[in-house]
């Protein structure tokens, strides 16, 4: 596959869970911006009913077609919204000093990344 060059030099953290319809809208915008570094954080399943959505979300974020450094933290257990917000940002900011933070229902315009 011929990879496109990154366009944005600010890392992006995407927090997601089991909502592929919402995540696909967010990820489409991120793909247009093509950040050079991407952090992917997913909370774990609460029960087996969450698994199809979790798998569908992982499939969406696996479709990276540009050059970027990708780090993934996919939790085995469910921490919930507030703890996941904290854990994901603590993880990302332990590696970088600035980062755009998006949740799976934050659909940015491409100009937001500039």
Where are the model-predicted features located?
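N-proximal low-complexity "stem/linker" segments adjacent to membrane-targeting elements
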Residues: 1-32
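Structural beta-sheet core signal
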Residues: 12-14, 40, 101
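Acidic/histidine-enriched, beta-strand-rich ligand/metal-binding domains
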Residues: 14, 64-67, 94, 110-111
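Acidic donor-binding segment of Leloir-type glycosyltransferases
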Residues: 29-73
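A short, glycine-/small-residue-rich helix N-cap motif at loop->alpha-helix starts
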Residues: 77-84
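Active-site nucleotide-sugar/metal-binding loop of Leloir-type enzymes
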Residues: 86-98
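Short beta-strand-to-loop acidic/aromatic patch adjacent to the donor-nucleotide binding site
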Residues: 96-107
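Acidic donor-binding/catalytic loop of UDP-sugar-dependent glycosyltransferases
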Residues: 106-114
């Amino acid at each position: 596959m011929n990879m496109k060059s990154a366009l944005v030099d600010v890392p992006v953290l995407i927090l997601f869970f089991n909502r592929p319809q919402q995540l696909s809208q967010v990820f489409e915008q991120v793909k247009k911006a093509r950040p050079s570094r991407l952090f992917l954080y997913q909370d774990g399943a609460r029960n087996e009913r969450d698994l199809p959505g979790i798998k569908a979300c992982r499939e969406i974020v696996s479709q990276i077609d540009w050059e970027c450094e990708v780090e993934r933290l996919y939790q085995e257990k469910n921490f919930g919204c507030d703890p996941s917000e904290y854990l994901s940002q603590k993880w990302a900011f332990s590696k970088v000093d600035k980062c755009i933070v998006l949740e799976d229902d934050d659909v940015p315009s491409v100009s937001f990344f500039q």
